[in-house]
Amino acid sequence: MCRGNLYIISAPSGAGKSSLISALLERDKNDSMTVSISHTTRSPRPGEIDGVHYHFVSHEKFEQLILENSFLEYAKVFGGNYYGTSLLNIEKNLAAGIDVFLDIDWQGARQIREKRPDVKSIFILPPSISALEKRLIGRGQDSQDIIAKRMEKAADEISHYDEYDYVIINADFDQALVDLEHILRAERLTVNYQKTQNAALIHQLLVK
């Protein structure tokens, strides 16, 4: 069985990352890809389901998992809550031939690259700063103060785009989705991937 690929997908809030990932999964008819479900110590928000949106655990449980080296990466964010990516769940999916997406920021991406040099990373950029702000306002979810803070954070996040393997500019959603699909397909056609996944065939072809 072919092994899945591990992908990091990062973007400033409002760039369309979550929508692109959701659309990609909807078009996946073979269950060949999934999003890693993070662990967190924060309380569930209305409509969130344990095991679907996050694995909700106590601080004590999370810190126990840290001691057990259960996370590929984790962070303690503003407000004191932990977020972490489970190593076991990722490995199970990759071994089953499933591509796994990590929806994380550039700081988490740095942690993972140090541990997993095989990871592929994609950064989603907005077509302009004004378009990003317009999308955040159009959501109708945040106050002007929160939007201002998100915009300030976005400038910092965007400055790290060149740490990634691929960049997609989400000016047109459908085209950005096609670009994302092409990246996934291309990664399964690299020489290194084919040498690993089709070693027996290549050996047979080279036998004189």
Swiss-Prot record:
Protein origin, superkingdom: Bacteria
Catalytic function, reaction form: GMP + ATP = GDP + ADP
Keywords: ATP-binding, Cytoplasm, Kinase, Nucleotide-binding, Transferase
Coiled-coil residue windows: none
Class of enzymatic activity (EC top level): transferase
Domain Guanylate kinase-like residue range list: 4-185
Record-linked InterPro entries: GK/Ca_channel_bsu, Guanylate_kin-like_dom, Guanylate_kinase, Guanylate_kinase_CS, P-loop_NTPase
GO CC annotations on file: cytosol
Glycoprotein listed as a keyword: no
PROSITE patterns tied to this protein: GUANYLATE_KINASE_1, GUANYLATE_KINASE_2
GO molecular function, one term: ATP binding
EC number: 2.7.4.8
Gene3D superfamilies: Guanylate Kinase phosphate binding domain, P-loop containing nucleotide triphosphate hydrolases
Function statement: Essential for recycling GMP and indirectly, cGMP.
Protein name, per record: Guanylate kinase
